[in-house]
Amino acid sequence: MIKQALISVSDKTGIVDFAKALSALGVKLLSTGGTAKLLADAGLPVTEVADYTGFPEMLDGRVKTLHPKVHGGILARRDLPEHMQALEAHGIPTIDLLVVNLYPFVQTIAKDDCTLADAIENIDIGGPTMLRSAAKNHRDVTVVVDPADYAVVLDEMKANGNTLGYKTNFRLATKVFAHTAQYDGAITNYLTSLGDDLQHGSRSAYPATLNLAFDKVQDLRYGENPHQSAAFYRDVATPAGALANYRQLQGKELSYNNIADSDAAWECVKTFDAPACVIIKHANPCGVAVGADAGEAYAKAFQTDPTSAFGGIIAFNREVDEAAAQAVAKQFVEVLIAPSFSDAAKQVFVAKQNVRLLEIALGEGHNAFDLKRVGGGLLVQSLDSKNVQPRELRVVTKRHPTPKEMDDLLFAWRVAKYVKSNAIVFCGNGMTLGVGAGQMSRVDSARIASIKAQNAGLTLAGSAVASDAFFPFRDGLDVVVAAGATCVIQPGGSVRDDEVIAAADEHNIAMVVTGVRHFRH
């Protein structure tokens, strides 16, 4: 039964109302520093920990709760007579509820002007110590680290005479250990990222010890293949606009492949300013287009490769209206993603309940790192978030691209970044015309892209081509020109650049180089 609570929080969200409710239930309140003042100012009967222990706060607040009267009251097992006798002998009451959250270390180090001294002063000592003590003794002590749990705790206390069940206490304790692990991980990441100049030096993006924290969203039916098990985890600091923030409106449970392909579709479509549609199959775009609205963008994207679009993942960067929904509903689609769906659009899919509809708010946030597991290790890199601007392009041929060709080249280049290497993408009039992906040779990707366009009945005459990496020989260029391309965008940087540029001049096409490669594995 909860008779006495100790409250000490940095994040004071909802704490006054929570404390008022506890007091109304007859719970005695202990508190420290600013929290105690806040509760007292709210008219609550609260005892300062310094008065409770008979030992004053000292060392600028570094020592407040590190006292046997605090930790004895938390750690004592109520089912062991010798523990309770020890408390009685030393005049230590039990502390049955601990409400603590920690100094804002992560928020502090995020500031541009944060110094090592600032960071050190925001490493909480007493808070984690109390939290771990209470979590260890969760059979007898309720511990709350998240303000979102205040209402849950109060509801159960009211329903059970100020008592919480073991399952609730266990769940709350596991949250504590996860929280303190993340907190210590952030401290380690920060300290091991510092260079030799500890006071003024810059931090490395790659600390000597890397701690990552993710919370499980759900278990999945299976992994990439049915014989593999899997689960989906969310970054504890999920950026705005990320796939993990999705809200599923209808449809079957998402699978491993659904989530992977949805991420590829969403990351690609949200890079466009104009209304856009991206259709993904096996993490590769098989159709990308912009249009006057979502419906037009979809019609153009679908036209690229109707065969591959079957059973694909479709993403929009605009609200899906009824017209777009009706067009999509004519095809078999696994997942449909958009910032929003009109009520009429939702009604279209009522008869197709297996279609998964995901809403995700648009946002430009990105993951801090791109991660790839290898045997016994982890490759960590910054995201490939470079979007080349027109002023950064360099024309290397005698003929310059026309304004329309330049628009098509920039569109093709944006798409190529999301195609598995080796990537060749034909585009024109704001849509993909043929996509060659994942081939071991660039010339084969070029051939496949042209064949795809031919199969879809699309002409490549006057098209623009993007290559995610340089042409090692002129053969790939010869293939795209023979197919009808009149301009090419590529990174450049090959030892045979002169040969490739000479071939472009020979064909009287325009070529621009970006100086940026977009390998994607």
From Swiss-Prot:
It catalyses: (6R)-10-formyltetrahydrofolate + 5-amino-1-(5-phospho-beta-D-ribosyl)imidazole-4-carboxamide = 5-formamido-1-(5-phospho-D-ribosyl)imidazole-4-carboxamide + (6S)-5,6,7,8-tetrahydrofolate; IMP + H2O = 5-formamido-1-(5-phospho-D-ribosyl)imidazole-4-carboxamide. Residues 1-145 form the MGS-like domain. It comes from the Bacteria. InterPro entries: AICAR_Tfase_dup_dom_sf (IPR024051), Cytidine_deaminase-like (IPR016193), MGS-like_dom (IPR011607), MGS-like_dom_sf (IPR036914), PurH-like (IPR002695). SUPFAM superfamilies: Cytidine deaminase-like, Methylglyoxal synthase-like. Disulfide bonds: none annotated. HAMAP family: PurH. The IMP cyclohydrolase activity resides in the N-terminal region. This is Bifunctional purine biosynthesis protein PurH. The gene is purH.
